[in-house]
Amino acid sequence: MSWLSRLNPRGPGTRTGRHAAPSSPCTADPETCLMVFENHWRQVSGVLKQRESSVGGFADDLTAVRNHTDQMLCLLAEERPAGGDIDSPAMGPILEMVVAENILEELVQWHVCRGLDPDSQLELLKLFEMLIGQSHQPLLLHSAVLQPLLSLLGACVDPQMGCPPALESSLVLLLNQVCVSMAKETAVLELLFRCGSVQQGPTNLLIFSLLVPFIHRDGALGQQARDALLLVMATSASNHAVARHITENSYFCPVLATGLSGLYSSLPRKIEVRGDDWHALRREDWIGVSSLVLFMNSLEFCNAVVQVAHPLVRCQLLDYLHNGFLVPVMGPALHKSSVDEMIASTAYLDLFLRCITETSLLKTFLRFILLHHHDNDTILDTLLTRISSNSRLCMVSLSLFKTLLSLNCEDLMLQLVLRYLLPCTHVMLSQRRAVRETDLYGKSADKFLSLIPECCRITSAPSGERDEEPAFWGKVLGSPTSESPVHPRPSTPSRLALFIRQQSSGGQANPSSSGSENAPSSPRGSVSSPLSPDSPMHQLSDFSEGETGYLEYLRDARKGIELCSWGCRDWSAPYDGENPSPNSAPLPPPPPTSNPSLSMVQEHFSVMDPTQQRAAVVAAARAEWSSSDRDSGEWDVTISKNCISLTPRSKKRSLLPSSIPLQSSSSASVSTEITGASETVYQHSRSTPHPALYNGMGQVEFTDSVDERMEAKKVKRDSDVNSGMVETGMNGSMGPVDYNDFHVGSTLKSSQVQLKPHLQHHTSVPSSTQECLPTESHRLSPVLGLTESSAASRGSESVERLIEELLERAPSEPLSGDSKCQGISIEAFHQELRELEERVRERRVSSRSSEESSRESRTAPLPSLTDEDCLPVETEQRSSETKPDSSTTGVFSPARPLGQPLAQPYTGPFITVLFSKLENMMQNSLYVNILLTGVVFQLACYPQPLLRSFLLNANMVFQPSVKSLIQVLGTVKNRIEVFAAAHEDFPAMLRKARRFLVARGKLDWSDSAMGVPSLRRSDSLIKSRKPSLGDLILRHTNSPTRARHAAQLALAHVRDGGQSLHSALFRGSAASGASGLEKQAEALRVKNAVYCAVIFSEFLKELAALAQEHAVALPFPPSQGTEE
């Protein structure tokens, strides 16, 4: 039979491996193949009929049956259809014989009756896998093939023990082939469902049930099982009966969700990295950690199932993921007490959100973040607290928020920012129309660029400095093209290729080169770096680091705005100050008084007792300020439970006219540290000799004198004005103090009473309304709550002492700082405070119903008063708003639960924390500032006029208690200039910092011999390399070789971790006579300040570019079908 060798050239007793390629098409005619098949079957059937009389020789019979069966199934697999229609071809003659005589059923039953040993099971599984995988005919459409297959599968899998380990790979491969065949022929699914019900009962779809246990397996086995299940999901997407079976009679969704929980518990609980710029898990970070790879594979499978599955399956899976994984596992993980575990869980959540692509699954994660409460706090509130934490946790949290902002989710943005801006209380009533205005003339951009500190506008380096420059600062090869801009391109990267957020398109920049060596810098001359290697990044420094490629920033801004606008095109409202209407927009709901975590009590601020908290605050303050200039200023952000308290320490000027003279140096700025745990307050540091007043909650429960709780910090004052200026910090602005406006509020918690003295002022007061000044343009405040007698007594003493000290130190003449306040006398002020004291005493004996009415009054919309509203004051509380003196300490709006509607304008905890971090840029590390400015950049890309005008419109007039981004940046500018004036070598340090950042951006970290070692997994995730700031600092792999080599040499000391970043750039800047610890602290402070100057200048140019691009951006039309 020479034809048989041509047909199947295999020796007796041997078989082609299951991974072998299919044999060549049959060279024999169908009739010959059928004759051979019949011959093999006659020999096999003879053995099968003798099975009952046979006593011995079972091994010989088994061998003969295997050999003949092998030949038969190979002939069947290589047979082609006999012809007929393309859609329904006729069966070949061999297949007709198999179906007519039920050959496969007899073979399987003979093996089952003889007893299926593992070897027999394995051989049969391989034979069926070969038959189904290589057949040219749809075999599974015939019950004569499908029924024996199901019988074999049922016999191979023990109901109690499951599949034997030796059979797992063959079983999964066979099931995968069945699912592939099912995907090609959807009718196979119906047959499987019907045959499975008959064979295994109505509660078991055998193919599906056998695959479920392998969902979370690692390696190729698990991947094949997931691929097969995904094919089942896709095929059953339109089959309601199968979908019902999966949801009602299988454990697919529970196994998938709870399996994720089990896999998450095996993830490393600590992420150890050597680089100080690490902030997010990238693929190269986790690809070597088996437990994380396994989890990510399962999560990606969930994402795929949600994408293709039937709606019934999708809904059940999402519900199980929320209630079986996110709530019981991710929730507690995000609230671990260990900082390392918080960092890991936050990084994991960020990674999950970046890997998920399906909208429904993203919604489930966002629902968990926005709505789920853990220990009475939402996950979002918890994550907000992390921004003000230590550097590493802050960086990971900022990275997470950048990921959240990139989702362009309306619900998320409403919760984070828009709900606080919707009532438009942050702008003056007459300015609401300006929310929708477009800045066509670039005034806002000009304002941002004007904030670049003069000390950062370096046009040339001294010759001594140039000699130290490495060779790669030479000009880029080639001459300028005809498209080169008139002014030179920059020599430091755009949005610093240095620091740009997730930009990997380094080669997309305009390749035009720079201009002449001595080209003049632009009017806004500042420094940046180009985005691409062929930009003037490599130019010689003799043309200076003078002017950044502003066009690069414009391109980045346009891209960011377009992506964001596209993502927001189906939002329910434009958020333009009119839709939704500010009058009908719901204010954030008040916290339930029954929830202890939402009431203004000690537990909001700390779990420590007053003594412990004071000790902790003082210790933290001393440790923090030991390495920095105490006069440089900082906001102490304390976020606990649902309250965010920001205690300003700043004494630098904010961005306000400098023509207002300051007070003499004998004045002191007072920063208060309250003893009680609940006494974290927003405080006024006064430039006048008045005691500190709280624009938040002043505590009634004082047990020591006020003087014992104050730390006086002296600052320079000018001596020609005694104007009593007060700086309101994050949500404040500048103006003279109006001592006629003062109100005290209280809230009740058990026997504890807390007062809320507010001292605020407006920018101007019309002289025609001086008599009714206390009521003009003021927001009505909540009435006082009830108190118990003991607490009321303490409250009375506190109020009386506060009033007496205020009266003793108040000026006896009208304030000289404001010509419009000349009609105000100290007698009127005295009288009003006495009336206020009487009202406080009357409220102590009011009934319980008065307390309930006060709560209702807090939730009611608060009217904006006009000039005609100047009537006698009949409310229990009033507030006046003051503009800050730029030399005094900033004060925030009152500490309050997250989401509480306010009597005073409040821009929300997210904006508050971001602005506080921004104002504290001088103390932040380089990488914190990079991530922080990246988040603000992402926020400013949103096209909604409410948000755009709040961040980028420098011409908007906000309420005096609301501090704008321009003011925050102005404060940073002043601090940088003060720092630069105090350090003669600042220009040299600035150039070195820029050079380092450019070199770092150009370095390909995988080039050197100190390559990236593989990740190791012990009990923690160890990343033994210094990453490139997670794509924020670009890797220019196509940079010239000599440039890369020079960069590697410049950073070799950083790569091995032996020296700090500062030691290479700022050697010798610390005081030589200081101790080692003091030198390190001073070096850290100097390093942060110099890098802050570089980041700050580039950030201003980014904001200017955003402001210009918003003016010309066009909205995208809504899509035809809104996504889920």
Curated annotation (Swiss-Prot):
Region of interest: Disordered: 1-25, 461-542, 577-599, 713-732, 838-900
Chain segments annotated as coiled-coil in the UniProt record: none
Biased composition (Basic and acidic residues): 838-858, 875-884
Pro residues composition bias: residue spans: 583-594
GO biological process, one term: lysosome organization
A GO cellular component entry from the record: FHF complex
Residue intervals passing through the bilayer: none
Domain of life from the UniProt record: Eukaryota
Pfam families documented for this protein: DUF5917, KELAA, RAI16-like
Skewed-composition ranges (Low complexity): 509-532
Function, as annotated: Component of the FTS/Hook/FHIP complex (FHF complex). The FHF complex may function to promote vesicle trafficking and/or fusion via the homotypic vesicular protein sorting complex (the HOPS complex). FHF complex promotes the distribution of AP-4 complex to the perinuclear area of the cell.
Assigned protein family: Belongs to the FHIP family.
Subunit: Component of the FTS/Hook/FHIP complex (FHF complex), composed of AKTIP/FTS, FHIP1B, and one or more members of the Hook family of proteins HOOK1, HOOK2, and HOOK3. The FHF complex associates with the homotypic vesicular sorting complex (the HOPS complex).
Protein name in the entry: FHF complex subunit HOOK-interacting protein 1B
Provenance organism: Danio rerio (Zebrafish)
